[in-house]
Amino acid sequence: VPATTADVQPDAPDIAPPSPGYPGARRPDRSRWVQANGLRLAAYEWGDPDGPVIFMAHGGFDFAGTYDQLAPRLADAGWRCVSWDARGHGSSQHAPLYSWTADERDALAVLDTITDEPVVFLGHSKGGGLMLDMAHAVPHRLTHLVNLDGLPSRNAWPDLAERERTAMLHSELTAWLDHRRRIASAERPPGTIAELAARRARMNPRLDAAWLEYVVPIGATEHPDGWRWNIDPSLRFGGF
């Protein structure tokens, strides 16, 4: 992962609790903006600022607020839990480019604002895959790795023939450019909190409806015609 620069900004992302709440869920104790790689990323913390750090990456199409149940429990056990909204997610800025490498650079930029000491890496789904790659790229920055249903990177395997890697890259780039053209003027359809929760439930029917209605006001914005998820419509899993 290339070296990055980060600058913590003085104002802070919103951490007001939604209404109604959800049993066991708690909004972060602190929040801040991190200027990283040309983007403003929203970072959040639960727990004692002097406690040992768990660095937490959320899943694809999620945001740091989806840790509002897990992080408080870890914080109450003495940990300092730190997460952030990935580029194009939650309160972080949208970007002209999304890639696995860009996510790694952003993660390292946020980590650099926390501590130089090794910490625990924790990631869920795509975030688990991201933390796997981070552990390989910067092994001196972690003590332990917790992978919750993590996905592997979509980078080409090193033992593939060069012509196969080239063909894969051509196919991926073509599909990505076609996708960008299709969504150039796209806008996420508005809805009520219940409607957005129902859409998210289709991605994972096991999730409690009340929990989904709790996270909508955290990861979405209310407009005159209804609520819309803050996630950039141009996003695709794995960057490309």
Residue ranges and their predicted role:
Residues 1-54, 76-79, 116-117, 152-153:
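Alpha/beta-hydrolase fold catalytic core
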Residues 34-39, 76, 86-122, 126, ...:
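Active-site loop/oxyanion-hole signature of alpha/beta-hydrolase fold enzymes
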Residues 42-93:
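Conserved HGGG/HGGXW glycine-rich cap/lid loop of the alpha/beta-hydrolase fold
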Residues 68, 108, 132-136:
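Short, hydrophobic alpha-helix immediately C-terminal to the catalytic nucleophile
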Residues 117-163:
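Conserved hydrolase catalytic core segment
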Residues 148-188:
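A catalytic-pocket lid/entrance helix-loop region that shapes and gates access to the active site
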Residues 187-240:
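Alpha/beta-hydrolase
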